[in-house]
């Protein structure tokens, strides 16, 4: 793919270390591309990673995750997005595991990862761990991903109730993460409806995003302390701007802020990009055609006028009649002066809105 200078979705992101005085082991990245020189379809990849491991090793794992996944996706042809994402997470997990055995201080390090890849208006995702992906559409907030934790498995099997799960001592035991000694199988399910089978959820890959849809990726430092309904209220009131995200961070910190907090939102433009481009091109073409026709008419009129003026066809002349014996003075004819041609200025051509060209916007905080 070809790096682009701007993303085709509006991006907002915040990250905070929390209130416990620990270093920030969360990382996020956003990178924008076009598919190829012959195919200008825009692509945007967003990643949130939450590192785990002592001696700052979690930072290393999370940093490796966002950098390696971003690079592997950027080097792809985007022909099979689900396979590319799955392989990128698996390869990154292997590299983190290998790195952890080169340095004793990094043994056991790992990281979660939540990835959202939007190609045009199609969404593809892959996750591992308990970092989440949400969809805000038509005033409703839908969690698209499933946590890979001991507690979530207990909930799925009816061993715990939601109330019991909230404060359970195993609440943060992660069952799937990048950096494990076992090969990673990324979770490719996109859950749009209650009761969907795993196969149905995976079939939602490539779902079409609608104008105004918003995606939210976050680490568990937010969702451990802030309810989904509160996230919805904040985004609905403030359109997912940095101010709304900072408000959610402040709310989590006010309730203890026991972990790093990272939130990233992606918002689809109000109208489909391709439709706006086609409309703009039609307008520009109409202006150009209309201007060309008007210019041709003016040039033709000017040419005809010049010929007539040159030949005297429209000009009257001052006549000097032959003197007659009985004339006291010559008679002067009144010249006919043609009216000046008025030129109508050409309408200015409307500029064609540029589709942002995009260099990598990857951010690691």
Model-derived regions: residue spans:
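PP2C/PPM-type serine/threonine phosphatase catalytic domain
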Residues: 1-364
């Amino acid at each position: 793919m070809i790096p682009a200078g701007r993303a085709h979705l509006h991006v907002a992101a915040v990250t905070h270390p929390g209130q416990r005085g620990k270093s920030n082991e969360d990382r996020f990245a956003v990178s924008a591309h076009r598919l190829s020189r012959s195919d200008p379809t825009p692509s945007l990849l967003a990643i949130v990673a939450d590192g785990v491991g002592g001696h700052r090793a979690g930072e290393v794992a999370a940093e490796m995750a966002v950098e390696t996944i971003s690079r592997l996706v950027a080097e792809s042809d985007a022909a099979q997005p689900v396979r590319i994402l799955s392989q990128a997470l698996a390869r990154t997990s292997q590299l983190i595991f290998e790195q952890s055995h080169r340095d004793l201080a990094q043994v056991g390090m790992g990281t979660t990862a939540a990835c959202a890849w939007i190609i045009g208006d199609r969404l593809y995702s892959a996750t591992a761990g308990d970092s989440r992906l949400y969809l805000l559409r038509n005033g409703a907030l839908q969690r698209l991903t499933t946590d890979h934790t001991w507690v979530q498995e207990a909930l799925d099997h009816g061993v715990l109730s939601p109330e019991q799960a909230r404060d359970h001592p195993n609440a943060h035991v992660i069952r799937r993460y990048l950096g494990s000694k076992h090969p990673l199988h990324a979770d490719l399910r996109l859950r749009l409806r209650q009761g969907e089978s795993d196969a149905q959820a995976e079939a939602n890959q490539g779902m079409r995003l609608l104008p105004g849809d918003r995606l939210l990726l976050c680490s568990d430092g937010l969702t451990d302390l802030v309810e989904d309904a509160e996230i919805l209220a904040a985004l609905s009131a403030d359109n997912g701007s940095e101010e709304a995200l900072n408000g959610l961070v402040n709310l989590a910190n006010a309730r203890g802020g026991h972990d790093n907090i990272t939130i990233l939102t992606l918002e689809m433009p109000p109208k489909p990009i391709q439709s706006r481009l086609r409309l703009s091109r039609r307008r520009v073409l109409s202006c150009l055609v209309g201007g060309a026709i008007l210019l041709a008419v003016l040039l033709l009129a000017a040419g005809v006028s010049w010929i007539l003026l040159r030949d005297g066809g429209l000009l009257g002349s001052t006549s000097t009649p032959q003197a007659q014996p009985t004339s006291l003075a010559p008679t002067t004819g009144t010249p006919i002066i043609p009216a000046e041609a008025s030129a109508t200025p050409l309408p200015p051509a409307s500029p064609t809105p540029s589709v942002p060209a995009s260099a990598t916007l990857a951010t690691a905080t």
